[in-house]
Amino acid sequence: MEENSIKIHKWLYPASWLYGAGVALRNKLFDWGKLQSKSFNVPIICIGNIAVGGTGKTPHTEYLIKLLHDEFQVAVLSRGYKRHTKGFVLSTAESDARSIGDEPYQIQSKFSDIRVAVDEDRCHGIERLLTLKEPPVEVILLDDAFQHRYVKAGLNILLTDYHRLFCDDTLMPAGRLRESAQGKNRAQIVIVTKCPPDIKPIDYNIITKRLNLFPYQQLYFSSFRYGNLRAVFPDCATVQERKLSSLQTEEQILLITGIASPDTIIRELEIHTRNIDLLAFSDHHNFSQRDLAQIKERFGKLRKGQRLIVTTEKDATRLICHQELDEGLKPFIYALPIEVEILQNQQDNFNQHIIGYVRENTRNGSLPERKDAHKS
């Protein structure tokens, strides 16, 4: 395995012990029934993690949408982190990253035929979704809700970063775990994300032993597959799409990220060019006028004729909202989309696991059998 990037602040262990005691007590109250988890008469799939930072929740949620939405009426419910609204909001054609959050808006932009909603109170959000008719919701995907135990999901999918496995981490603030690694026991599926596409068989075995899962838990490994660069402002761009392979080694890229961990996208771009100027912001960062001015200044320092601005799909949703963004920059801004690939020839098994759960628990038991396994 590659050396992990985990940094533990040992001097913060006392604070972590206090934090851990509080989290453990909360989990025990749910286990003992003192705090109630609510079940719903609809298949609910929770996608989450037990660590702060990016593990690829949104790309994996999009994978599930692609897998299910041709057959079932899919809804996605998120908290809508850093949105400018409160309460339950159902996405519409007028929604943007400000009203529903960047990740829900990204999902709605790519899948206009599903319902996307946000609500801080997940139980209330589910209840509102279940009142929708024509057609009724048949499966709900809960984004980043592994610690939201007031909802009892029928299928819990836990993600852990290949470069930062939860078994190597410790509780906040010394580490990045939201709860003890024992929280993994609530998951029926564990996915090791962001794996190298050429991961060695011995690494599968090492990670499997280190995660130490129970027999009822299924373990999968996934990797990111990058698509073509797509113009964020297509009306301004002379080229709508560019293959990564078309990048020239001398081409200069200003990479703008507001995500938890930009390492993966940096590694991908470095395959094609070494001339990368990184402008990194915090996760879900709301770009200010000062930030936009900094982007313009940094881009202006790159050689004319051989320069490009690359950002993530999530960051693109927030850039689009800004009327203050310099018009001269728009033709040069491209988003780099990512898709999830299940490794080890386990894609069909994973797909059938998900589809089987939804079929067995849907309120509409008369759905026809799926003829072909999903291929992505």
Curated annotation (Swiss-Prot):
Keyword presence, Transferase: yes
Listed GO biological process terms: lipid A biosynthetic process; lipopolysaccharide core region biosynthetic process
Keywords in alphabetical order: ATP-binding, Kinase, Lipid A biosynthesis, Lipid biosynthesis, Lipid metabolism, Nucleotide-binding, Transferase
Residues annotated for ATP binding in this entry: 51-58
One cellular component term from this protein's GO annotations in UniProt: plasma membrane
UniProt function note: Transfers the gamma-phosphate of ATP to the 4'-position of a tetraacyldisaccharide 1-phosphate intermediate (termed DS-1-P) to form tetraacyldisaccharide 1,4'-bis-phosphate (lipid IVA).
NCBIfam families on file: lpxK (TIGR00682)
PANTHER family documented for this protein: TETRAACYLDISACCHARIDE 4'-KINASE, TETRAACYLDISACCHARIDE 4'-KINASE, MITOCHONDRIAL-RELATED
The protein, known as: Tetraacyldisaccharide 4'-kinase
Organism: Bacteroides fragilis (strain YCH46)
